[in-house]
Design a protein with these regions (language model features):
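Secretory-pathway ectodomains
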Residues: 25-683
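Bacterial N-terminal signal peptides
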Residues: 8-20
């Protein structure tokens, strides 16, 4: 599946489900076996016509009727709660709250955030008379939800409030967070103070969960640490900007991965470490770079400070502009005192979007002039291993240093396709004269469910990197040590004008998965099994299947956030191979260490933890939706990845647009069989 870009943590492809659509097999297919009908586990009659339904990351099934929004226990088939005030909402008005198990429902004048398992309302915008929600952040370590909002005109000052995740009780509300901590100035200085305060009230807070007892926030008026239980300010700090008194811009907060006594704060062109206990700066002065700070990477040999190219009219200092791009400079700071390993920042062409850790080095991805360049940074010496940056197609997605050099895979962007190649570190030249390439560039639509078809799908087994290239529809094997590649077998053409959206290694061979195709390929490139199921005529029918990946991603985000802010930031930010270590640590903590998704109601935490453990197993099947054999209605098939045969099937009836939902973690399908009747099938 197309990997979700994050800077420090990429969930392994084995943990991200490939879900797709397609029944009535055609084309090059093996002898078909008759799938067994799915077993109806329960039947439930709702109060009113069922409009839509959706599975939540926590495991509850939300069902909407004109009368109410209800939750159904998927194991027992029983309604666990109802909310009449949320009846008749369109499906897009009920959404997951990122990095949590919670859901939110919105309608004009109302925002509700609730626990889908217990039905507890954690936040109701009417309680504080809020007209606008500026910031909302779930903090599972302290079991809270932080909300920052602005009231209706005349309704009072902006407020920051904290709510208990389990009960919805308000722990505290703070209306003084945006007040100036400096003495009140007169004249122009006072005007500037008031302007900064007004802007701060309308700007989303930077929030960091610093353990179970402390929350650190940044507003335009400064850095504040709040007691998570009472909301009392423990300490405040003013960021040391280049010109004293100027508010810091582009502020980001980072947890320390290895030193629990501190946090890191980047702002403008600099970085500072602060002691959590009292907010004291741990370094004499902040290390600086050229450009804005885009992010940091905490490498064992130092903190890599990634630069971002500012707009030319906002650049400060000694500005260098080439071809309309403001040039930048990267540096590496020491953990002990913040001093930089080299005096002058290393010159970069533009924004360094990523630094993928590879042993003692980091592979840099640089965005300049709408093109991507790569280089290799030796972190301990803060030097570049390539004499000049190497331009690649697309955007960097995967990189590793091998005996042959820098092996990389890119992903397509709106203008360029993707490629696989190896860069010789001595010469700086690519080893493959004709790189392995994908087909068309990605169209640029983030809502395109089939965007993954434009990527180069790959899988590693031992010293071999398998790559499927949609450019010529062939499977390639790259020797990671020798830096060579060869084509395996002949062209693998999918039917229905499709390309694979995922590939994985299984005992039977390599499996190529597309919305309506599944192909099992031997390791020598020979096709063992291939099936194709024509798509239903209405694309909207596939929405429930496309949602499966979002549900899994939501569950992983909640697990990462509950385990710690370092994992939460990693899951939000990154794309590199070092994140396998973090992901493995996270999985081990929940499966062997007995960790729970803390902070939520016990019932919700237990159910979500059980689902998270179950989700770690790579699914052995995919779901495909297709037209019924007689052409009247639709059928959902569960296709085995190893045999390419249907395991089970469910007839979705004769409706043009059946109302159904699938939970691949629990192995269930939920179908409206009559206007007010819901049936749960065990697959």
């Amino acid at each position: 599946m197309a990997a979700v870009s994050a800077r420090r943590m990429l969930l392994p492809l084995s943990l991200v489900i490939a879900v797709h659509a397609a029944a009535g097999a055609q084309g090059a297919a093996p002898t078909q076996t008759t799938p067994s009908g799915a077993t109806a586990a329960w039947t439930l009659r709702m109060k009113g016509d069922i409009r839509w339904q959706q599975v939540t990351p926590a495991g509850a099934l939300l069902v909407s009727t004109d009368a109410a929004l209800s939750a159904v226990d998927i194991e027992r088939g029983q309604v666990t709660w109802e909310k009449p005030e949320l009846g008749g909402l369109p499906p897009d008005s009920v959404r997951m709250v990122g990095g949590s198990l919670l859901m939110e429902a919105a309608r004009p004048g109302l925002l509700l955030i609730f626990d889908p398992v217990t039905g507890s309302v954690v936040f109701d915008s009417r309680r504080l008379n809020l007209a606008q929600i500026v910031t909302r952040r779930v903090l599972p370590q302290s079991g809270t939800l932080l909300v920052h909002g602005r009231r209706t005109p005349g309704g009072g000052p902006p407020v920051v409030a904290l709510y208990d995740l389990a009960t919805g009780a308000q722990r505290w509300a703070n209306e003084a967070l945006f007040e100036q901590t400096e003495p009140q100035k007169k004249g122009l200085g006072g005007l500037m103070q008031r302007l900064v305060t007004a802007a701060s009230e309308a700007t989303a807070l930077e929030v960091l969960q610093a353990g179970p007892d402390m929350i650190v926030v940044h507003t335009l008026t400064g850095l504040r640490a709040l007691d998570a239980r009472t909301g009392v300010m423990r300490w405040s700090a003013t960021l040391p900007t280049a010109r004293a008194g100027n508010p810091a811009r582009h502020v980001r907060l980072y947890p320390s991965l290895d030193k629990t006594d501190r946090i890191y704060v980047s702002f403008d062109d600099r970085l500072m470490a602060y002691r959590l206990a009292d907010g004291q700066a741990l370094w004499t002065k902040p290390p600086t770079i050229e450009g804005w700070v885009h992010g940091i990477v905490q490498h064992p040999s130092g903190i890599i400070i990634l630069p971002e190219s500012p707009p030319a009219n906002q650049a400060t200092g000694n500005v260098r502009i080439i071809n309309g791009v403001v040039q930048t400079g990267l540096n590496v700071a020491r953990y002990e005192d913040g001093t930089t390993i080299v005096d002058k920042p290393l010159r970069m062409r533009g924004t360094v979007t990523d630094a993928m850790i590879a042993g003692g080095s980091a592979v840099l991805a640089v965005d300049a002039e709408s093109r991507t360049f790569v280089n290799v940074l030796d972190v301990a010496t803060a030097t570049l291993r390539l004499k000049k940056d190497v331009k690649i197609k697309g955007q960097l997605a995967y990189a590793e240093l091998t005996p042959a050099g820098l092996l990389y895979i890119s992903r397509p962007d709106p203008a360029t396709n993707a490629e696989v190649n190896v860069i010789d570190l001595a010469s700086g030249e690519p080893k493959f004269k004709d790189a392995i390439e994908s087909g068309k560039p990605w169209g640029g639509n983030p809502d395109d469910y089939n965007a993954a078809r434009y990527s180069l799908h790959h899988a590693v087994e031992g010293t071999t990197l398998y790559v499927f290239a949609s450019h010529d529809h062939r499977l390639y094997a790259v020797d990671r040590n020798a830096g060579t590649f060869r084509a395996l077998g002949g062209e693998i053409k999918l039917q229905g004008d499709e390309d694979p959206v995922d590939m994985e290694i299984r005992p039977a061979g390599l499996v190529l998965i597309a919305p309506q195709n599944l192909v099992v390929v031997a390791r020598d490139g020979q096709v063992k099994q291939q099936v194709y199921y024509p798509a239903p005529q209405l694309p909207g029918l596939l929405r429930a299947l496309h949602r499966l990946n979002a549900v899994r991603a939501g569950l992983y985000g909640a697990a990462a956030s509950a385990y710690g802010d370092a994992f939460a930031q990693a899951s939000r930010n990154a794309t590199d191979t070092t994140t396998r270590r973090l992901t493995g640590q996270l999985a081990t903590a929940y499966t062997q260490g007995g960790a729970q998704l803390q902070g939520y109601a016990s019932q919700s935490a237990a159910l979500a933890t059980k689902r998270f453990k179950a989700s770690l197993a790579t699914p052995g099947s995919v779901f495909m939706l297709t037209r019924a054999p007689d052409g009247n209605g639709n059928v959902l098939l569960q296709i085995d990845k190893d045999s390419a045969q249907p395991r089970s099937r469910v007839d979705l009836g004769k409706e043009r647009e059946p109302v159904y939902a699938v939970d691949d973690i629990a192995g269930m399908l939920f179908l409206r069989t009559a206007p007010g009747t819901l049936v749960g099938y065990r697959l």
